[in-house]
Structures are given as C-alpha cells and as structure tokens.
Amino acid sequence: MSNSYDSSSIKVLKGLDAVRKRPGMYIGDTDDGTGLHHMVFEVVDNAIDEALAGHCKEIIVTIHADNSVSVQDDGRGIPTGIHPEEGVSAAEVIMTVLHAGGKFDDNSYKVSGGLHGVGVSVVNALSQKLELVIQREGKIHRQIYEHGVPQAPLAVTGETEKTGTMVRFWPSLETFTNVTEFEYEILAKRLRELSFLNSGVSIRLRDKRDGKEDHFHYEGGIKAFVEYLNKNKTPIHPNIFYFSTEKDGIGVEVALQWNDGFQENIYCFTNNIPQRDGGTHLAGFRAAMTRTLNAYMDKEGYSKKAKVSATGDDAREGLIAVVSVKVPDPKFSSQTKDKLVSSEVKSAVEQQMNELLAEYLLENPTDAKIVVGKIIDAARAREAARRAREMTRRKGALDLAGLPGKLADCQERDPALSELYLVEGDSAGGSAKQGRNRKNQAILPLKGKILNVEKARFDKMLSSQEVATLITALGCGIGRDEYNPDKLRYHSIIIMTDADVDGSHIRTLLLTFFYRQMPEIVERGHVYIAQPPLYKVKKGKQEQYIKDDEAMDQYQISIALDGATLHTNASAPALAGEALEKLVSEYNATQKMINRMERRYPKAMLKELIYQPTLTEADLSDEQTVTRWVNALVSELNDKEQHGSQWKFDVHTNAEQNLFEPIVRVRTHGVDTDYPLDHEFITGGEYRRICTLGEKLRGLLEEDAFIERGERRQPVASFEQALDWLVKESRRGLSIQRYKGLGEMNPEQLWETTMDPESRRMLRVTVKDAIAADQLFTTLMGDAVEPRRAFIEENALKAANIDI
C-alpha cells in the first residue's frame, strides 16, 4: 500500500506543478484580479452543480478579514471513502488530481457549469493554505492543505446531523500579484447571475471586512432576472415574453421585455457561464427577432401606415433580454469562454424564437401594439438623427478642419500620446490653456451642465451644443452607424471639475454620456478623473499642496511629531524621533481599521480590546479562561460607559469545534444586541492587529507621564490624549486654504498640481459590474423619482465633506 501511495502522490504533484507553472491556462490572468476571483467561482460552481442535481439549497460565500474566502454548501458533502485506484480518500483525490470529479461520469451531473473540469484541485494548487471541512454520514471530516499538499490524511473531528462541504482558501501571493484582494462587487455580480440562472438556489455573500451582506434568492429564474434588470426603468408592456424549451439535447431559455429607455441590453449565457461577446446564441436571437417583428408589422399593416422600414437596431431599442442555453458539449472561441461558436445553437435558438415570439405577438395584441409603436418611434428618430448629422456635416465642411472653436488642440498626432482635458467653465479653461503642455495636452472648456443623456432621445442629444462640441472633439463619431472607438483622437480623456456639488454633477453627466454612448472608451480605460489638490498649507514662507483629507492628517501628524518627546514617567528615557513616529503611525492605522469595523462592532468595545490582555486560540478551549477574560472586558466597559448603555456577557459552547466563544451583549434603550467574539474573530487579522498595538501601549504611560514639544509640556493619562494635544499644538501658525474651484489656482499652480505628468494624480474609470452600473445610472440619472429618493435615504449618512 505504501509503495502505491508514494507513487500516486508523485503523480499528483506533477499535475499540480503544471498548474503552478502556467496558472493562466487554468484560471485566467493572475495579475489583474480575474484569475483571483475565478478561484472563488470554481468552488462555487461545484456547489451549484450539487444544487442543479437537487441536493443543495443554500450556498454561503464569505470574504474573511484575512483575505481568505470560504464557500459553504448544504449538499451531500464530498465522498470521504477511500478511492479504489488512488488509495487515499475520495475527497483528497478531488482536491489534488486534475480532471477528477463527478463531471465525467455522465450519471452524476448531466450539464455542468464547472468550468474546465479542473475545478477545485486548481484552487488548491494556487492557495498557500486550504481548509476542507466535510459534513457527511453523521461525521465532521477536516483536512488542511498547503500549496496543494495535504498536511495529514482526512480526519474525523466531531459529529453532526448536517451535511455539506466547506472550502476555505488563502490565495498564494507567489501566484497572484498586483491585485491580491477580493472585490465584493465582482463576486456579487457573478453570484447574482448564478442565483437567477438556477431558480430557487439561495446564495448569501458576506464580507467580514466591512459587514456588507447580500442575499440572492430568486424563484422566477431568468424571468425574474429581466424584472430585476428593469427594476428602476419603466417597462412599456406588462407581460414578460418567456419560454423554456429543449430540442435535440439543446435547452433554450429566453426572457425579454421592452422599457421606455433607448439602450439595448442582452445578456447571454451557456451552461450558466456568461458570454460577454455573445456568439451563435445571440446571432440566432437577433435574426429571429428582427424577422418575426418585421413580418408581424408587414402583416398587420403597421409599416405601410407609418411609412418607415424598421431595422434590427430599431427593434432592440429599450430591450432587456436574457438568453440562456444549456449545451452538452459547447465550443467557445477561447479558454475565457467570452464567445460561443457552436453552430448548432444558432438554428436551435432561431427556430424556437421565430415560432414562440410570433405566437406571443398574436396572443398579446395590446403588448404587440405598444412594442410596434416604440419600434416605429425609434425608426423615425433614427431618420431625424441622420438628417441632423447631415446638417452638421454640411456645416462642418465650412468649419476649419471640423474641430470646435473652443478646443485648444495639441501638436501631437498620435492618439496614444495625446490627452484631452474636459474642463468645467471658461475661467478654469483659460488657466488650463495657459498652464498646459501644448505638445500633447488639448483643452476643451465646457460651459454649464451638459445634457443628461439618460433621459434624452438621440436626436435631442445631437442638437445639444455642448454634446455636439464634445463629439466633434473626440473624433470617433456617435450612433450605431458612425461610432468607431478606434478613431478616438485622444487615448486619455481627463475630466477636470471643481470640488463642489456642481463639479460632481458635471462629472456625473459626462460619465453618463461616456457610459451610455461610448462604452468601449470606458472599457478600454481611456477615461480618467483629475484629482486636483484639496488643500494648500502655509507655514511661515513654506507652501505645500495636499491632495486629500488623509494626506492632511498625515501632514499634521508629521509636523506635530517634529521635536516632540513622550516621557512615560518622570525619570524614564523619553520616547522620540523614529520610535515615537512608528508607534503613532501604528496607532493611527489601527484606529482607521477600528473606524471601518464600527458598522459591525461597538467602537467602545474595540477600543477597550487594545487595553485588555490577548485572548489566544488555545484559550478558547478553556471555559474558565474565556469567562474570566470576557468578564474583565465587560467590567471595564461598564466603568467607562457615558451614554447609559449596559454591558453584559455570555459564553457560547461551540460543540462542533469543542470551543467556548465569548459573546458581548449591550443593552441600549432597553434593546439587547449580541456581538459574538467567535473563533473566526479571535484568529482573524483585525483582532491580531488590535492585540499587537495593545502589547505596545499597555502599561506604557505611568501616573506622572507627560508630552513635550518645544518649550511646552502637558501631563497625559493616555496615548490618545498625548496625540490629540500634539495635533492641536501643531496647528499654531499654520494657515490652511481649501480649494473648491479650479479657477482659484493660477496657470502655474494648475500645471504643478493637476496637469504635470510627473506630479499629478488621476483616477482611471473602470466598470467592474455592468449590471450594477446600469442600475446605478438609471437610479441616479433616470426619470423615476422614488428609487432615487430611496438611494439618497439609504446612503446619506455615508457621505462626508459635501461642499454646497
């Protein structure tokens, strides 16, 4: 047995070594975050396959504070018996052998979303640590892996009545570079899609870093998906067109509804995997739709009456659709599966769409009439826009080189090296024109607010002077017939507005324009937001620009520490220079972390934890130690309480892990709230940082401690007090000017702070979650008032430093 065990483990490592050498082949880019998030989806896909087979109801995905992710499901649990060929547990085979699992035995899973049949073993190979917990047949099994190597065989650690699998992994920082932190939005987008595509599965996403949580649970499948996508828009007909059929082994499911907007949004999926670039299913859908609608309009006499002929683009204006196909052996144009190329899918989708859409139009004449009316309006608007463009072109022939008069162009002709600044107002535009580098920086001042394109029809948009100027300057045209992102004249478009409410509004209007009319420009990373400094600080004759509030805090502390000494008692050597600076920066970093945690735990408790002895993981096994520790914490909190709250405690027995976990209970205005300081909290990175600071501060200051700066000294009882006094002292003789408008700076200052490539700061505009972005633009910029009011009520308290 031992011989075969050795040889099989060597074979396994060879397989996983290949993954470590070429991780991109298995999970995508390891540099830009796509591969990192793909790791989560590989594990989630296994749970979804359990759900599709009817064994799993709930999946919980948690981003932990130490940047690990766990995926827990209540399925059958991975088999734990010994595998006949490999001689180790089946779970270990699944975790360590490529192309192992139930996907290849056609009886286990019919259609599977598991992406490349490599799944969880790849996640294991690319994780510095992975924890596997299986609940199955009344027992809890646990195993730990490091870089894909099991540290011990699968072991039974307890008993349970539940079933399911939990995989928690810490991504290897040797593999993943640049982007190493999980982004909530990217995970939320995919999990939301999965919950729609797998009707009835409940998926929870929790972020332990800031307490954010979402529950995705939709019964109506893709019909509910279309409802969700149309949530803040105004659908023009009540009945969603929906069908789900299967023919020759290909399942086709389509849901669609028109709204009163002008954007077309079609989302395509194959076996639950999204195709960003569409493919044969999208081609079949579009062809059938145009043909069926045109045939209906001809037959019912609409086209003749309206004297227009509609195109496919007119038919898809304001359309929201989801096309989901289930194909046993799909073919894609590349490993990333962004485009489906299986030719048999086109005819399958086209055939079903032709038949069933024609049926729907005949059975719902009211809906059909409304939809046809919208299509005719779109065709007329297209004609009007074409005429408007021709007018513009004729005028343009008289204009020099066809560029707007306000544009101060640059000498550079290579778009990759050219920058266009969109500047708010003529006064700032004047300063920017004087301060710029003429070689590669062009300036276009925009007067007033540009049109809100979310609410405007295409022909109205073209007649807006500011929008027309902007389109001409960019040079890539607009509208379906003319728009060509490759003709963009500047590869850096920099939005430069004031730091007040009007500036924010203009920036939002411009972003709406780019996102709705020229999405590729945003996707290719050509749009930036300039970050002019917020403050100018003057001390004596020295002047300094400061970018934001965080930098301002740092600046004040660096001045405060200049010449400061902290005496921990009357006779001890003073703490000064680098040692004091290190302690202050660690204290500030921990305070910032505590402020972020405040939404999940009471701030008073977190601050008190700094001064309490450290509770270790080993301590959690001893009930007496835990009780003593939490009792001391609660006593201190009650002694220092100033707002009338009452603090109590409890100890929770965690039978599954044989642990005792403290619970802090606070009663405010007669209402009790529990804050469990469980195993995860005690072993997490946040508590570790609190304890590290605590070890340095506990007992640091004695009764006669004082802080000294220059000639002045102050007795202090706590480190916090000492820091507050220092910052107040540092403000003497300091004049702080807060900039609101770009016009407040002269051309030299504007160049130095905002336009000089050596010293400026810019934010690149990216879109992580297209559906969430679409909803946000609709909520904030659309016609409906209610969703906007709800958004403001929900987020008002999170806004800080609003300049009105």
Swiss-Prot record:
The gene is gyrB. This is DNA gyrase subunit B. Its EC number is 5.6.2.2. The active site is at 42 (proton acceptor (atpase activity)). It catalyses: ATP-dependent breakage, passage and rejoining of double-stranded DNA. The lineage of its organism: Bacteria, Pseudomonadati, Pseudomonadota, Gammaproteobacteria, Enterobacterales. ATP binds at residues 5, 73, 102-103, 109, 115-120, 335-337. Gyrase is the target of many classes of inhibitors, including coumarins, cyclothialidines, pyrrolopyrimidines, pyrazolthiazoles and (fluoro)quinolones. Coumarins bind to GyrB and are competitive inhibitors of its ATPase activity. Cyclothialidines also bind GyrB and are ATPase competitive inhibitors; they seem to act differently from coumarins. Pyrrolopyrimidines inhibit both GyrB and its paralog in topoisomerase 4 (parE). Pyrazolthiazoles also inhibit the ATPase activity of GyrB. Keywords: Antibiotic resistance, ATP-binding, Cytoplasm, DNA-binding, Isomerase, Magnesium, Metal-binding, Nucleotide-binding, Potassium, Sodium, Topoisomerase. It comes from Escherichia coli (strain K12).
